[in-house]
């Protein structure tokens, strides 16, 4: 996915929840006072906050998204993700391509404020379709997959560009200010 998006002219930053090594969530980024936020969380929050759009990639575990991905998302509040589009890519070893995980991820992303585009990418029998590095196997018809990915990427680009342009006209955080009168409200967009 990274190479495909870069090929479309995008700068892509990968946040692999396993590589980041965040602990099981006990205290999210927004629950710390600004001077107490762990540096790692602050760096991730800064990178996520400055992104124009998000592509989440998840395997399906027990009909649900990756616990590591959900843990990563839950470390940050909606003010990190708000007013930007997202796309969902899912995969599984079975015939459904992680569809159930993708559907479960949709309301999580919506609550974070990075509304998912309607088109999703599902990769069934991923072990037969892609190599461990994420490239399509030689036995796969690359043009067929590119055609499938196009709808999702086009929607994400359209919404990303529209949100960015409108943000230049109207600051969404002023139009819809965050509730910040108490610590319990810090997460609200």
For the regions a protein language model found, what residue spans apply to each?
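Short, glycine-/small-residue-rich phosphate/pyrophosphate-handling segment
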Residues: 85-128, 143-147
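Short, surface-exposed connector motifs at secondary-structure boundaries
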Residues: 52-54, 84-87
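A glycine- and small-aliphatic-rich helix-loop capping segment at beta-alpha/alpha-beta transitions
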Residues: 71-79, 107-111
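N-terminal beta1-alpha1-beta2 submodule of the flavodoxin-like/Rossmannoid cofactor-binding fold
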Residues: 1-74, 137-150, 164-189
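Mobile beta-alpha loop/short-helix "lid" or hinge segments that flank ligand
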Residues: 13-24, 78, 114-135
């Amino acid at each position: 996915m990274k190479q495909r998006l870069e090929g479309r002219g995008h700068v892509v930053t990968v946040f692999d929840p396993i590589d980041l090594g965040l602990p099981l969530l006990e205290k999210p980024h927004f629950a710390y006072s600004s001077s107490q936020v762990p540096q790692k969380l602050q760096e991730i929050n800064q990178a996520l906050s400055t992104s124009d759009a998000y592509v989440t990639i998840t395997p399906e575990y027990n009909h649900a998204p990756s616990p590591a991905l959900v843990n990563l998302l839950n470390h940050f509040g909606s003010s990190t993700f708000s007013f930007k589009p997202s796309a969902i890519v899912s995969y599984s070893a079975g015939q459904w391509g992680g569809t159930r995980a993708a559907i479960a991820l949709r309301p999580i992303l919506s609550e974070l404020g990075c509304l998912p585009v309607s088109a999703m990418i599902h990769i069934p029998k991923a072990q037969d379709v892609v190599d461990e590095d994420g490239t399509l196997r030689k036995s796969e018809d690359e043009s067929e997959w590119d055609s499938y990915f196009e709808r999702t990427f086009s929607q994400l680009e359209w919404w990303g560009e529209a949100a960015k342009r409108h943000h230049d006209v109207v600051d969404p955080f002023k139009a819809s200010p965050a509730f910040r009168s108490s610590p319990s409200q810090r997460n609200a967009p």
